[in-house]
């Protein structure tokens, strides 16, 4: 398990959702 990749995935998803809302 790679916590870094998991954390990066969360950041990417959060950024996409933020850009979609804004």
From Swiss-Prot:
Function: Acts as an interferon antagonist when expressed ex vivo.
Species whose genome carries this gene: Severe acute respiratory syndrome coronavirus 2
Biological process terms in GO annotation: symbiont-mediated suppression of host innate immune response
Keyword terms, alphabetized: Host-virus interaction, Inhibition of host innate immune response by virus, Interferon antiviral system evasion, Viral immunoevasion
Stated name of the protein: Putative ORF3b protein
Miscellaneous comment: SARS-CoV-2 ORF3b is homologous to SARS-CoV ORF3b, although the proposed protein is much shorter due to the presence of premature stop codons. Elicits strong specific antibody response.
């Amino acid at each position: 398990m790679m916590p870094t990749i998991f954390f990066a995935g969360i950041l990417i998803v959060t950024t996409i959702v933020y850009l979609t809302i804004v």
